[in-house]
Amino acid sequence: MIFNKDTAEKTAELLLQINAIKLNPKNPFTWTSGWKAPIYCDNRMTLSFPAIRNYIREEFSKNIEKQFGKPDVIAGVATGAIGIGMLVAEYMGLPFVYVRPEPKK
């Protein structure tokens, strides 16, 4: 579901600018889920670009408040969403937690 078409298009442009989107139809990527796909987006690359990470942080924060109101906490899945999740939580003045794929042993 796209909450804001302009934000989605600009984010896609930014991801393409920093080569975060990889295509390889001949040798599909294996995602953490085990799925194979010809496309991979390394969202963690955005953390190395201050202007891009700030844009994403602000747009995520605006969309969260618009769609859900002010939450009690921000959660990010390990490991790919920890960085952006922390940025959003800090920006919104909220606690942050991360979600593991399985309980810690």
Name what the model sees in each region:
Residues S61, E65, T79, A89-G93:
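Generic short alpha-helical segment signal, independent of protein family or function
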Residues G34, I74, F96:
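Conserved hydrophobic/aromatic pocket- or pore-lining residues that grip, position, or stack substrates
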Residues G85-K105:
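Short, glycine/charge-rich flexible loops or terminal/linker lids adjacent to PRPP-binding catalytic cores
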Residues I82:
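Glycine-rich SAM-binding Motif I of class I
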Residues V77-T79, P101-E102:
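Histidine- and/or cysteine-centered catalytic micro-motif in compact active-site loops
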Residues M1-G69:
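Active-site-facing substrate-recognition patch
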Residues G69-A78:
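Short glycine-rich phosphate-binding loop at a beta-alpha junction
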